[in-house]
């Protein structure tokens, strides 16, 4: 049986003509409405948004030469930088993670933890870490998301490939998402720019009423929005 039930907790109805043909809805009494869809539609309705609290998660990780369980709630006293990437043993990915590793101390000094995420297993992470000169520098947790569950929640999962897009997410101490960067997989990211965004997000969180202009750096000029500033920039 097909349903036209809107995909929200509050209920309501959705025009069935707007639902893609590859969208299958099945009802189970014990669970309510279950929706199965392609990832491109999933991203539109489930991707976390700026200003929203991130749901706690737990994943296996390769860290300090060991397999560990990592939970978001274990880092409540820190800012968190999540860096999603397509796959181990590839080409752009090791350059990105190497640059993150080289700037890891600066992220920690800013009170943040860095974690990388891909759909590889912990065992593949270990093999990559053992063999790649670039990845041997990595000291931060490398999260394993082989089912793509976390990638789907953050809107980075590519259903047709089983891989993640290049997505970077900055989360504050309260678990609120403050910044997103999403790239095509052919475009590498800058660890220094990610660090700059983290420092800017921290600054405005600690200085109510002030905002950071383009390319702001610590110690640089900030702005205080108000009627007196209108038209003067």
Task: Locate predicted features.
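N-terminal targeting signals for export/organelle localization
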Residues: 2, 13-60
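Chalcogenol-based redox active-site neighborhoods
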Residues: 25, 45-233
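Intrinsically disordered, glycine-rich low-complexity segments
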Residues: 5-7
